């Protein structure tokens, strides 16, 4: 039996690059919850069905501000009073190529359309069965949420800045935390990483980039 051990961010990036799923856990003093995550560019009916069947939480599409503007998405509420200021927009659906919109196939298509680089706003309608969330510019260095973390991983994996996330619930309807999360991860052979580690990873990497840029500047005497 595997020990309850968090994976490093490098291993999560490798999984994301290969189109795989993984779990991100936020701080104990925040939601203290785990989300199943994969890059939106790798969406498939199979992955959506896995989330719906095993994750049991709300399946959401995380987007950056730029993509949300292309879709002219309005916030779900003009005044965000949610505890963690999660930036939900109106729900969406692909205008064409779907049936009722709720099937794994339909939701997968909606996500594919909504994350196209050249998407037109009339390709998406509201309301629908996919729930977009807009990430803060600056990612986890600005807001340590699953929304920002999922997009940061996508960007670090050299993929479009969008992801699909779903909270993990236990069979009894309670939120999966701690040992329950590791049990879930072990059962489904998924790796778990902490958002706190992603924050540290970004600080370290971006500091090194700045130092390299600084050292490349030659001052003439």
Regions found by a protein language model. Give the residues of each.
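Catalytic domains of riboflavin
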Residues: 1-221
């Amino acid at each position: 039996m595997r020990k309850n051990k968090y994976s490093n961010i490098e291993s999560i990036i490798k999984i994301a690059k290969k189109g795989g799923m993984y779990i991100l856990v936020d701080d104990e003093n925040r939601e203290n919850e785990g989300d199943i995550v994969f890059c939106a560019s790798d969406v498939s009916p199979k992955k959506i069905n896995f989330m719906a069947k095993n994750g049991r939480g709300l399946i959401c599409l995380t987007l950056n501000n730029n993509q949300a503007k292309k879709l002219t998405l309005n916030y779900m509420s003009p005044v965000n009073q949610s505890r963690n200021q999660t930036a939900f927009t109106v729900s969406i659906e692909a205008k064409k190529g779907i049936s009722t919109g709720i099937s794994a196939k339909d939701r997968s298509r909606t996500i594919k359309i909504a994350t196209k680089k050249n998407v037109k706003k009339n390709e998406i309608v509201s309301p629908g069965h996919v729930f977009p969330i807009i990430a803060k510019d600056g990612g986890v260095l600005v807001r340590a949420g699953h929304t920002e973390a999922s997009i940061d991983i996508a960007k670090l994996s050299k993929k479009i800045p969008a992801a699909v996330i779903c909270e993990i619930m236990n069979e009894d309807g309670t939120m999966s935390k701690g040992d329950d999360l590791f049990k879930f991860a072990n059962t489904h052979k998924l790796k778990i990483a902490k958002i706190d580690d992603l924050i540290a990873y970004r600080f370290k990497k971006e500091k090194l980039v700045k130092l390299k840029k600084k050292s490349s500047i030659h001052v003439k005497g």
